[in-house]
């Protein structure tokens, strides 16, 4: 279980994978057939594959092996029982397949947002499950791009990608420089024509269906961290605040 080929699966934490193997790009682990398929479709390079026998024999398993053969030729493929895979990964696997993949250089914010119309900006969303859920919602609602501050969980963390159902490979995103947030980033967004709205609980917050927002050509929706929400300085830098009405005091 501790061969060099399996080291990336059982001896490195995800934050180490980001820097240890290739400081400029690093690696990540994609989990589950659907997530792996979407990562391959997005052009991410597979480096090795670890899977249960039942997954290797499944239709999606054969599809994944076929796609990998097309784009990368031969890579290490290890087949084992669910118990062995769970021991290697350190937790119970429900979907029986892990793929080590190479990260790509992140795009610049200007390139990502130049032609977009609707973007989401995440400020210090630290839980990978929440990041994944936001990406899934962003994909469903037609958000063109997502910007994340440096304090956010990595969208390519295993849990984030799994919860997103692989949409982290479909919705373009990048991580902002800490020194640029929020003042410089807000200034850049305005220069690109964005109307910025903070999702915040304030008495003067607009409803999402407010007429003021109907004809906004380019909209940047700013969402804050779990619990505390957006920082006061961030809210002050936005053009408007928006609040989704909820019953029973739920916020």
Name the predicted role of every residue range.
Residues 1-66, 152-153:
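Boundary-proximal intrinsically disordered activation/regulatory segments immediately upstream
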Residues 97-99, 137-141, 155-168, 232-251:
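Structured adenosyl-cofactor binding patch, chiefly the S-adenosyl-L-methionine
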Residues 54-56, 82-84, 151-153, 178-179, ...:
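Short, acidic/turn-prone active-site loops that include or flank metal/cofactor-
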Residues 40, 69, 190-191:
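Anion (oxyanion) recognition and catalysis
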Residues 197-250:
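Active-site/ligand-binding-proximal alpha/beta "capping" segment
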Residues 65-94:
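Glycine/small-residue-rich loop that forms an oxyanion/phosphate-binding "nest" at active or ligand-binding sites
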Residues 74, 78-79, 83, 105-204, ...:
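RNA substrate-binding interface of SAM-dependent RNA methyltransferases
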């Amino acid at each position: 279980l501790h061969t060099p080929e399996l080291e990336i699966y059982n001896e490195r934490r995800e934050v180490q994978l980001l820097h240890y193997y290739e400081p400029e790009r690093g690696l990540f682990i994609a989990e589950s057939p659907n997530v792996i398929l979407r990562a391959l479709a997005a052009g991410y390079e597979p480096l090795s594959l670890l899977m249960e026998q039942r997954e290797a024999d499944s239709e999606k398993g054969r599809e994944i092996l076929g796609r990998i053969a097309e784009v990368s030729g031969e890579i290490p493929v290890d087949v084992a029982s669910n118990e062995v895979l769970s021991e290697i990964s350190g937790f119970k696997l429900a979907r029986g397949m892990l793929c080590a993949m190479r990260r790509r250089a992140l795009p610049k914010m200007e390139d990502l947002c130049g032609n977009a119309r609707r973007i989401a900006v995440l400020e210090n969303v630290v839980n990978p499950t929440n990041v994944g859920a936001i990406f899934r919602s962003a994909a469903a609602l037609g958000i063109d791009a997502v910007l994340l501050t440096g304090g956010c969980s990595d969208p390519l963390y295993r849990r984030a990608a799994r919860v997103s159902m692989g949409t982290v490979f479909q919705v373009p995103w990048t991580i902002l420089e800490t020194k640029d947030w929020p003042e410089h980033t807000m200034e850049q967004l305005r220069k690109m024509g964005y109307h910025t709205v903070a999702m915040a609980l304030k008495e003067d917050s607009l409803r999402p269906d407010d007429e003021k927002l109907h004809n906004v050509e380019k909209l940047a929706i700013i969402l804050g961290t779990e619990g505390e929400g957006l920082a006061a300085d961030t809210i002050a830098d936005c053009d408007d605040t928006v609040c989704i009405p909820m019953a029973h005091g739920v916020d």
